């Protein structure tokens, strides 16, 4: 297997494993690209393929595990649209002004900051916010989700932090973060759909799609099954260690 193939296998595995748990897929992928010195030749076709595979894995999980029903779809689709508006607005602003801030030092700090907020939201019972309406919770979580524009913070993590602050269980917070991932991943996919014009399926594209799909489905299944038992502390510890390693490496 060539170095190029190894890179894309790792890319798919990292995307699939990290997309739906609170450790940041973008942060890990940026680290991978920097380590492989591949930022210059970034291929948005492969990135879009990975997002599509993640989306398919997520939808398959939700449908096969009966998280989606006619009543659920009817209850949530409008809420999810409203909850996604803050991310759409901020994303457009960043795109218009071509704001880019990929660097390992920032990823180190945001990884640690996200870990602290995740720990506080999970453990501090006294600061739980009493919000009864589920629609309000989702819309407020949409603002938290904007933290994910900081590389290393984690989209799933920002949503879980919000729902834990709103008093939801670990499992429900994690499932709601999956729901909120649907429109975001769809937007990410369709924003780069032009990359598929006149594309040719090659080995690397296939590697990314397959590894992302199976890694994502497996990770979601295990994560939702065990999260009430293990809690978020293992993710907090991992994030702090990763952040410290990055900052020490750069010092």
Which sequence ranges carry the predicted segments?
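Multi-pass membrane proteins that catalyze or facilitate reactions on polyprenyl-/lipid-phosphate substrates
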Residues: 1-251
């Amino acid at each position: 297997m060539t170095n190029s193939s190894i890179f894309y296998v790792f890319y798919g595995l990292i995307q699939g494993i990290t997309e739906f748990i609170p450790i940041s897929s973008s942060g890990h992928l940026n680290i991978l690209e920097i380590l492989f010195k591949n930022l210059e030749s970034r291929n948005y076709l492969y990135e879009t393929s990975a997002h599509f595979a993640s989306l398919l894995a997520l939808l398959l999980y939700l449908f096969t595990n009966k998280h989606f029903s006619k009543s659920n779809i009817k209850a949530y689709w409008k809420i999810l649209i409203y909850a996604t508006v803050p991310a759409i607005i901020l994303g457009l602003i960043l795109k218009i002004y071509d704001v880019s801030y990929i660097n390992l030092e920032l990823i180190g700090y945001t990884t640690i900051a996200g870990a602290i907020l995740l720990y506080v939201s999970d453990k501090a019972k006294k600061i739980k916010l009493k919000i009864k309406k589920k629609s309000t919770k989702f819309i407020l979580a949409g603002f938290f989700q904007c933290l994910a524009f900081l590389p290393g913070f984690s989209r799933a993590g920002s949503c879980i932090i919000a729902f834990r602050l709103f008093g939801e269980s670990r499992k429900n917070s994690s499932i709601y973060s999956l729901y909120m991932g649907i429109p975001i991943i769809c937007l990410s996919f369709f924003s780069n759909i032009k990359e598929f014009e006149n594309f040719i399926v090659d080995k690397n594209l296939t590697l990314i799609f397959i590894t992302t799909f199976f890694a994502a489905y497996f990770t979601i299944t295990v994560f939702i099954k065990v999260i009430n038992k293990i809690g978020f502390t293992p993710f907090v510890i991992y994030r702090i260690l990763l952040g410290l390693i990055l900052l020490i490496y750069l010092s």
